[in-house]
């Protein structure tokens, strides 16, 4: 679809959202005006909204919130909510289906999850000012049984194989190279979905729950293969999340890949309860230490940086991609940073550093309180 339009629309996208507090709307006290202002807003959901179910044993951490908390997402201004998450089935299929229904009842469009695989693969299409925007979502962080199949509920899978390749075969016990690649069946289904949707919409956005959590800069090998394939099949913008930390922004063939948008609004106040757990956290990220001033948000220091991705769509194409630097405070509330806040430059410099570290040549240009992403 390529008929020109004189209209322009804006899209905002953020990473992981997990609300579990007495006053759910308060988590968006500082960002609701920004999210609401966009014509379309997207987020990734990391919790169930249900009073039913029991924790499934195949996941270490389990997230569930009251159904009433879902209204906070609509209050904030979100339209499209990906539920293709490694926590989507934490409390079983009843809680999973409750969440999908609750999102719909609150006026939002769930994505990447459904009562069967066909529903989980189904795109969301939104029209604004004569411009059609299509969304697809896939999950590669998959506890056993969390993916949809046949008539089984779950999220839309993009399963990944991991191989450990010995670098020096003649040296037993030396470090290995970690190789990752997508399962052929899921990968082909994803490409078919994108090609089909490409013919139906003006703008196509694909969301991936993927990557290496908490680790500074590192990207998994499969992210590059999958992200590039998505664009080769017709995707205009890739939104990545799950890592709970910002990752590099890549420009591939003129299209932007946010490898990780980081956390956005995430209630998490769990402290390490054993020396072993403390050591495990530090092995992921050396900044993961308990800070009493951040008792309501006990993620690593690096996880306090986040962004609101912005996309300007003009003449039925993406004409500009940018982001708003933001900081997550000790009450787990994201705050948009002003240009004169020193944390603004710290975040931009952090992204520049990890972008260079991964070998991307993406350029960042500050424009007021936005940062434009340049190829």
Segments predicted by a language model, with ranges:
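Acidic, metal/ion-coordinating pockets
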Residues: 1-375
């Amino acid at each position: 679809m390529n008929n020109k339009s004189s209209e322009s629309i804006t899209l905002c996208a953020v990473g992981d959202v997990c609300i579990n507090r007495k006053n759910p709307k308060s988590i968006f006290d500082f960002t609701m005006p920004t999210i609401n202002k966009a014509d379309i807003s997207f987020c990734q959901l990391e919790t169930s909204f249900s009073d039913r179910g029991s924790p499934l044993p195949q996941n270490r951490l389990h997230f569930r919130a009251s159904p009433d908390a879902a209204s906070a997402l609509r209050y904030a201004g979100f339209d499209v909510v990906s539920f293709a998450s490694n926590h989507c089935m934490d409390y079983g299929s009843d809680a999973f289906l409750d969440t999908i229904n609750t999102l719909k009842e609150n006026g939002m469009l769930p994505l990447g999850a459904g009562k069967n695989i066909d529903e989980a693969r189904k795109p969301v299409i939104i029209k604004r000012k004569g411009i059609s925007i299509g969304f697809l979502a896939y999950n590669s962080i998959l506890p056993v049984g969390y993916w949809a199949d046949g008539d089984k509920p779950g999220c839309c899978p993009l399963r990944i194989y991991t191989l450990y390749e010995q670098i020096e075969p003649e040296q037993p016990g030396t470090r290995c190279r970690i190789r990752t690649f997508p399962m052929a069946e899921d990968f082909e289904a994803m490409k078919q979905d994108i090609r089909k949707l490409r013919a139906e919409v003006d703008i196509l956005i694909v969301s991936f729950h993927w990557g290496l959590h908490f680790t500074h800069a590192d990207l998994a090998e499969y992210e590059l293969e999958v992200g590039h394939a998505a664009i080769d099949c017709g995707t205009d913008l890739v939104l990545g999340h799950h890592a709970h930390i910002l990752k590099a922004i890549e420009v591939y063939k003129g299209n932007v890949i946010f490898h990780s948008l980081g956390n956005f609004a995430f209630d998490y106040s769990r402290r390490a309860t054993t020396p072993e757990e403390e050591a495990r956290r530090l092995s992921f990220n050396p900044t993961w230490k308990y800070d009493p001033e951040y008792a309501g948000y006990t993620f690593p220091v690096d996880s306090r940086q986040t962004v609101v991705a912005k996309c300007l769509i003009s003449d039925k194409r993406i004409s500009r991609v940018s982001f708003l630097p933001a900081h997550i405070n000790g009450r787990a509330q994201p705050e948009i940073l002003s240009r004169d806040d020193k944390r603004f430059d710290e975040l931009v410099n952090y992204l520049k550093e990890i972008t260079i570290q991964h070998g991307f040549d993406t350029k960042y240009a500050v424009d007021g309180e936005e940062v434009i992403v340049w190829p």
